[in-house]
Amino acid sequence: MNEKTDIFSYKSTFDPRLNINLIFKENPNYNNMRDIFDVYGYGFVAPEFKSIFIDGEIFLGEDGFTLDDLKFIEAHEISHILLGHNGPRSEKDELEADLGAYILLKKYNISTERLEDEFEYRHGVPFSEELLTMVEDKM
């Protein structure tokens, strides 16, 4: 990727109607977006633009996130849409979005390792496929 790139966009793997946009610090809107990332995490959905915005800076450097991490973030954000989450951020919605992401990642044969490794830290309970019953009928 060219160092001067300020945004990298592609169609979602999970829903090609949505654009995935990785925003980098060279983008003139990055500082404003950074404030949103600080509130919502690595990414957020902008349904009015049919887009998901992800902080591209987390993928740079030796300790940067991987392609599997990117797909986890993408699947998580798309799960918010599929699950009808549209209110203020809640722990329940975040838990459900991670479970939805697990279902999507498995469906597309993409690693769920990061999701499973981080699940207890993120939600206070260990990951179990039994939890999927919370969202299976909505996905």
Model feature map: region roles:
Residues L67-F72, D93-E96:
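Alpha-helical scaffolds flanking conserved acidic
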Residues P16, N29-M33, D98, T112, ...:
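Short amphipathic alpha-helical segments that mediate assembly, nucleic-acid/protein binding
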Residues M1-R34:
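A metal-dependent hydrolase signature that marks the N-terminal structural subdomain at the beginning
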Residues L83-N86, L105-N109:
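Hydrophobic/aromatic-lined pockets within catalytic cores
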Residues S90-K107:
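An active-site-proximal "capping" alpha-helix that borders the catalytic cofactor pocket
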Residues I23-K25, Y30-L67, I78-G84:
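Active-site scaffold of zinc-dependent metalloenzymes
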Residues E74-L83, E96, G100:
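Active-site His/Glu-centered metal-binding helix of metallohydrolases
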Residues K106-M139:
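Long, well-structured alpha-helical subdomains associated
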